[in-house]
Amino acid sequence: MSSVRTAVRRMKPYVPGKPVEDVQRELGLHDLVKLNQNENPLGPSPRAVAAARAAMAQVHTYPEGTARRLRERLAQMWNLPADWFLIGNGSDEVFRLLAEVYLEPGDRVVVPEPSFAAYRFVAELMGAEVVAVPLAGWTMDLPAMAEAAARGAKLLFLCRPNNPTGTVFAEADLRAALERVPPSTLVVVDEAYREFDETPFDSRALVQDYPNVVIARTFSKIYGMAGFRLGYGVMRPEVLAPLYTARDPFSVNGLAVAAGLAALDDVEHVERTRALTREGKAYLYAAFQRLGLGYVPSEANFVLFDAGRPAAEVFDALLRRGVLVRPCGSFGLPDHLRVTVGTPEQNRRFVEALKAALGEG
């Protein structure tokens, strides 16, 4: 039997949450409020669902390898050439391809901490050295990250809004940091939650002004298409072209592309989701204040809050009451939990369950 690569042996596998059906069966629950994975409670656009159904008639054929129609649609939306766009099986594939193509064993990769685990995962998979830079006041410490990158980093990952904090940094601060980052360092800005963010930030100008900047986005969040696995990267063609060498030509299925095209055209669905999220966050903030709990104001569709006690205990107490959230011990925040903004009824049930859970202590 062949031996496993050293880098893989050292890694801890990512453990996804249990399927809702399994949790319901184990706990005898019939109605579980799922607020643990930052999904859109409104679901996908009805137009996206209809487009996917129509595309079912062609599932016997292979999809077009580069998702040309979706790239062209995104090019119109961004006002950039189509060859600046790479369509992936979720934005995770974009991260993985960047690591596979640009990293050698021992290369340095700078990541924020706490943040999305995929950055560390793809770096460690390639045997890279991960340099984690702690947040400062719940947001990215851009000067410290630029300083770390200046010491020979191949990749620098940023997340805006950050997961799990929901915080953002100013465009001017990022530009100042980019001036200190070597041109040989690829700076990947993960914008999975960008469509929820109401602060000014010109991603298009950044990728135009800095040849080493990559923007990553997903259809999983505001577009409600997590199950389709669809995302994209925006970058200079000279950065993008080598990724096709390592990319599976059929990693993105035709149903996802059809749904993505329709989702981009349903502006009303996006606006309804934004309004629901805005109102839901205000409701949750007020509830946390009444309960005397600290929380981090968020530009995403979730809120990080301090339970004032071990998060695992609160998680279990909420789960017994039919509410599933995300304990943040894996992020290095043992007393914090992250809750997705749901529908008004889901938010109400969460708050009622949280009151009862805190009353147990």
UniProtKB/Swiss-Prot annotation:
EC number: 2.6.1.9
Residues modified to N6-(pyridoxal phosphate)lysine: 221
Pfam families noted in UniProt: Aminotran_1_2
Matching InterPro entries: Aminotransferase_I/II_large, HisP_aminotrans, HistidinolP_aminotransfase, PyrdxlP-dep_Trfase, PyrdxlP-dep_Trfase_major, PyrdxlP-dep_Trfase_small
Keyword Ion transport (UniProt): no
Domain of life: Bacteria
Leader sequence segment: none
Keywords from the named record: Amino-acid biosynthesis, Aminotransferase, Histidine biosynthesis, Pyridoxal phosphate, Transferase
Cofactor: pyridoxal 5'-phosphate
Gene Ontology biological process terms in this record: L-histidine biosynthetic process
MF-aspect GO terms: histidinol-phosphate transaminase activity; pyridoxal phosphate binding
First-tier enzyme category under EC: transferase
Catalytic activity: L-histidinol phosphate + 2-oxoglutarate = 3-(imidazol-4-yl)-2-oxopropyl phosphate + L-glutamate
Pathway membership: Amino-acid biosynthesis; L-histidine biosynthesis; L-histidine from 5-phospho-alpha-D-ribose 1-diphosphate: step 7/9
Subunit structure: Homodimer.
Similarity-based family: Belongs to the class-II pyridoxal-phosphate-dependent aminotransferase family. Histidinol-phosphate aminotransferase subfamily.
HAMAP family linked to this entry: HisC_aminotrans_2
Protein name, per record: Histidinol-phosphate aminotransferase
Organism: Symbiobacterium thermophilum (strain DSM 24528 / JCM 14929 / IAM 14863 / T)
Gene it is expressed from: hisC
